[in-house]
């Protein structure tokens, strides 16, 4: 697995990933309506120029399969939100998301000096929840019925990891 900076050169892959309805089922609401390539270009330009985010592409065997990183990076509060989307579903359940997550946590805590990294995950997304717990995230709360997919409301789980927890985990 290789993780490197996400750029506008990844536009076709990015558009392909967010067009995969299975991959974005529990992702950002912005990805749910079918989007054209121009929308994807504008979105990608926006996130890759955002100084408060760190956006990476995940590659396996010379194939780009998704993206991950940190958004809303706050130097004052020393926290950020973790995100990941593996758009090539044939790479699900192979530990790639877990490995990518560990890489992002290492970067956030070691390089950026963050104190807290957090995320939200849709309650039905069991595979993601297992992966997040495996890399050390803990459940902090529930945002009740915060998401609506296919006319059904479900809750989002707020998870977080503190630097001291990550350091203790790294020692064991």
Describe the residue ranges of each PLM region.
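Conserved GNAT acetyl-CoA-binding A-motif
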Residues: 110-120
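Conserved active-site tyrosine of GNAT-family acetyltransferases
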Residues: 132, 137, 159
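Terminal substrate-recognition subdomain of acyl/acetyltransferases
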Residues: 152-172
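A short, well-structured alpha-helix characteristic of acyl/acetyltransferase catalytic modules
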Residues: 1-41, 165-172
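Conserved acetyl-CoA-binding loop-helix of GNAT-fold acetyltransferases
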Residues: 93-107, 129-134
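Acetyl-CoA-dependent GNAT
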Residues: 35-90, 162-166
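Conserved catalytic-core motifs of GNAT/GCN5-like acyltransferases
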Residues: 118-121, 138-154
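Glycine-rich acetyl-CoA-binding "A-motif" of GNAT/NAT acetyltransferases
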Residues: 63-66, 127, 153
């Amino acid at each position: 697995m290789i993780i490197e900076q996400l750029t506008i050169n990844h536009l076709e892959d990015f558009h392909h990933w967010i067009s995969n309805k299975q991959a974005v089922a529990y992702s950002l609401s912005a990805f749910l309506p079918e989007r054209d390539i121009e929308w994807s270009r504008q979105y990608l330009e926006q996130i890759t120029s955002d100084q408060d985010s760190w956006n990476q592409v995940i590659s396996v065997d010379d194939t780009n399969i998704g993206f991950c990183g940190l958004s809303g990076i706050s130097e004052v509060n020393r926290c950020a939100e973790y995100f990941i989307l593996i758009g090539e579903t044939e790479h699900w359940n192979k530990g790639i998301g877990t490995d990518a997550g560990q890489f992002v946590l290492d970067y956030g805590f070691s390089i950026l000096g963050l104190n807290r990294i957090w995320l939200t995950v849709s309650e039905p997304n069991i595979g993601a929840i297992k992966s997040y717990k495996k890399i050390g995230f803990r459940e902090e709360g529930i945002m009740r019925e915060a998401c609506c997919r296919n006319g059904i409301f479900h809750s989002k789980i707020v998870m977080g990891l503190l630097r001291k927890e990550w350091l203790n985990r790294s020692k064991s």
